[in-house]
Amino acid sequence: MNIYCVTLNGPAPWGFRLQGGKDFNTPLTVSRLTPGGKAAQAGVGVGDWVVSIFDANAEEMTHVEAQNKIRAATDSLKLTLSRAFHPAGGEQKDSLTSSSSQPKYSFAPSTAINKMARPFSASPGSGSAGPVIKPVSYALKPALSSPHNGHGVAPCPVTVKSKPADKHDAVQAPAKAPVSSGPACRPPWVTDPGFADRYHPDKSSTVVTQHTQPLQPTPMQNRSSILQAAQQSPAHSSTATPLCAACSKIIRGRYVVALGRSWHPEEFMCCQCKRLLDEGGFFEEKGSIYCSKCYDNRYSPNCAKCKKIITGEIMHALKMTYHVQCFLCAACKLPIRNQAFYMEEGEPYCERDYEKMFGTKCHGCDFKIDAGDRFLEALGYSWHDTCFVCAICQINLEGKTFYSKKDKPLCKSHAFSPL
């Protein structure tokens, strides 16, 4: 056990938050740190156990007793802690996970004074702010379609070769390429039937995929021949002579083999622009063959913002597609990419700017109220449910009648006690 002591110079806030206690049957631990706060600068880590507060044994303290002990500190706060084990990069990973895996909301404090404190709990269906985004890694790997017996949607290099017509040549075909059932740029909610079930309608998600262009032709000396001599030896001439898939005529001389069929070289062309495909990649979709340019124009998605065709990285968010450089934070104007973002009045915000502009703090502990935290509104402020206690006896007032004096809540027993 790695025990260490820290002394934080006052005044509050101290820059950390506790969880657990004797009343929870769990040790007091540091649950959250304020970035750049006093505790973080002193080397305190998330998950560290609190051994003592001002030499008072913390193992015998309840959660409220520990809070009161810390609140009583004015000039300095002395803590003895036990270091929790953090794997390499663990703290950063925990921080990222906690900030991106839960929905976060902005809470506007009520200006009216409540005489009955009502608890609220942040849930995906409540709150006025937009939902949080859980980034999802999604990559589509296009299949290469080699010009031999096989099927797929992919670019393919084509080679022109001539061979003597009086020799019998076997067709050399490379290994079959992976089979793809659709174009490589389809959105995930089209190709994945379970997409709508995994992402609730009131949530938004971002997915970055890659739209891959056709491969460049390989050097001539490294290619496998896809043009073969059509004339075979007399013994095989009746069965081995190929037929053109375009004109259905017998091919005499060299020919192209692709997708399990044969073509005259001058008839193996894009079905739209009619450009010959004997040198370059091609795409096959629903039995038709396209060059890379025509395929992009026909099947590549359009950006929901600029309406232009997307090539390269595709940003999937709010069930639409964007260029990465078109989906920006409304405040800092930087690309959000695969990070969490929040919607406010129809505009996306990165996590840092959203918390800066719309975040709400607890009036009791001065810490931010995070998504998932139980909280209540009283006396014109927002409070964590564990922070709304009587200012004198520290009894929890959640759901109970209370009195107020100098903006501080009091229970019935201390309603007329001096502060």
From Swiss-Prot:
<feature type="region of interest" description="Disordered">
    <location>
        <begin position="174"/>
        <end position="232"/>
    </location>
</feature>
<dbReference type="GO" id="GO:0048471">
    <property type="term" value="C:perinuclear region of cytoplasm"/>
</dbReference>
<dbReference type="GO" id="GO:0031941">
    <property type="term" value="C:filamentous actin"/>
</dbReference>
<dbReference type="GO" id="GO:0003190">
    <property type="term" value="P:atrioventricular valve formation"/>
</dbReference>
<keyword id="KW-0862">Zinc</keyword>
<dbReference type="GO" id="GO:0030036">
    <property type="term" value="P:actin cytoskeleton organization"/>
</dbReference>
<comment type="function">
    <text>May function as a scaffold on which the coordinated assembly of proteins can occur. May play a role as an adapter that, via its PDZ domain, localizes LIM-binding proteins to actin filaments of both skeletal muscle and nonmuscle tissues.</text>
</comment>
<dbReference type="GO" id="GO:0001756">
    <property type="term" value="P:somitogenesis"/>
</dbReference>
<feature type="domain" description="LIM zinc-binding 2">
    <location>
        <begin position="301"/>
        <end position="360"/>
    </location>
</feature>
<feature type="compositionally biased region" description="Polar residues">
    <location>
        <begin position="204"/>
        <end position="232"/>
    </location>
</feature>
<dbReference type="GO" id="GO:0001725">
    <property type="term" value="C:stress fiber"/>
</dbReference>
<protein>
    <recommendedName>
        <fullName>PDZ and LIM domain protein 7</fullName>
    </recommendedName>
</protein>
<dbReference type="InterPro" id="IPR036034">
    <property type="entry name" value="PDZ_sf"/>
</dbReference>
<keyword id="KW-0440">LIM domain</keyword>
<dbReference type="GO" id="GO:0003294">
    <property type="term" value="P:atrial ventricular junction remodeling"/>
</dbReference>
<feature type="domain" description="LIM zinc-binding 3">
    <location>
        <begin position="361"/>
        <end position="419"/>
    </location>
</feature>
<dbReference type="GO" id="GO:0046872">
    <property type="term" value="F:metal ion binding"/>
</dbReference>
<dbReference type="GO" id="GO:0030018">
    <property type="term" value="C:Z disc"/>
</dbReference>
<dbReference type="InterPro" id="IPR001781">
    <property type="entry name" value="Znf_LIM"/>
</dbReference>
<dbReference type="GO" id="GO:0001947">
    <property type="term" value="P:heart looping"/>
</dbReference>
<feature type="domain" description="PDZ">
    <location>
        <begin position="1"/>
        <end position="85"/>
    </location>
</feature>
<dbReference type="GO" id="GO:0061061">
    <property type="term" value="P:muscle structure development"/>
</dbReference>
<keyword id="KW-0479">Metal-binding</keyword>
<keyword id="KW-0677">Repeat</keyword>
<feature type="domain" description="LIM zinc-binding 1">
    <location>
        <begin position="242"/>
        <end position="300"/>
    </location>
</feature>
<keyword id="KW-0206">Cytoskeleton</keyword>
<dbReference type="GO" id="GO:0015629">
    <property type="term" value="C:actin cytoskeleton"/>
</dbReference>
<dbReference type="InterPro" id="IPR050604">
    <property type="entry name" value="PDZ-LIM_domain"/>
</dbReference>
<dbReference type="GO" id="GO:0033339">
    <property type="term" value="P:pectoral fin development"/>
</dbReference>
<dbReference type="InterPro" id="IPR001478">
    <property type="entry name" value="PDZ"/>
</dbReference>
<dbReference type="GO" id="GO:0003779">
    <property type="term" value="F:actin binding"/>
</dbReference>
<dbReference type="Pfam" id="PF00595">
    <property type="entry name" value="PDZ"/>
</dbReference>
<dbReference type="GO" id="GO:0007507">
    <property type="term" value="P:heart development"/>
</dbReference>
<dbReference type="GO" id="GO:0003143">
    <property type="term" value="P:embryonic heart tube morphogenesis"/>
</dbReference>
<dbReference type="GO" id="GO:0005912">
    <property type="term" value="C:adherens junction"/>
</dbReference>
<dbReference type="GO" id="GO:0051371">
    <property type="term" value="F:muscle alpha-actinin binding"/>
</dbReference>
<dbReference type="GO" id="GO:0005737">
    <property type="term" value="C:cytoplasm"/>
</dbReference>
<keyword id="KW-0963">Cytoplasm</keyword>
<dbReference type="Pfam" id="PF00412">
    <property type="entry name" value="LIM"/>
</dbReference>
